[in-house]
Amino acid sequence: EISGNYDTVSVSMPVLMNKDLPLTVSLVGGAGATEDNCVVEVEPKSIQVAGDTTVLQKLNQLVVATVDLSSFATSYEATVTIPLGNDLKNLSGVTEATVRISVRGLETAKVTATNITTTGTNRRVEIMTTSLDVTVRAPADTISQITADNVRVVVDLTNYRATSGTVAVPAKVYVDGFSNAGAIGEYVVNVHFTGG
């Protein structure tokens, strides 16, 4: 037998709200491109979610992806999973979004870079890659001015202290003299470690 004498009972229940959240993309500028010269489309444009009022009041959008603009030349398309925290419920039933990005007003050109240097080591090394074909992106009035003299390839060997033999090492490409230009893609340089 259970008995009690209560004047008041306190029950705490979370208040849930529904909200349409636009889906967006975070852009990392690079190779002459910024969010100002990109057209971004996300499909669907938004989803409806439910969640605790205190959580949803702080959310105005959902970032579905972060895209490095130096990773592609003129267009990008990917299907991504819509990220939702455990405290939110997707009422739309759509779990993936398609992201399309177009770069406008910029042109690309191939430049053969021969200025290849290393940094981050005092070991004896030999750069086996003597030239590297680099794709450069910039506004039309700038692209024609860029030559091999402006393109510099730097290989950071800081993490290769105990390495021996020939190794393909990621390289960074710089376009000197043009702040609105840069290299597209990833590059590697073959480096031979000759001694200690």
Model-found features: residue ranges?
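Structured interface patches
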Residues: 1-196
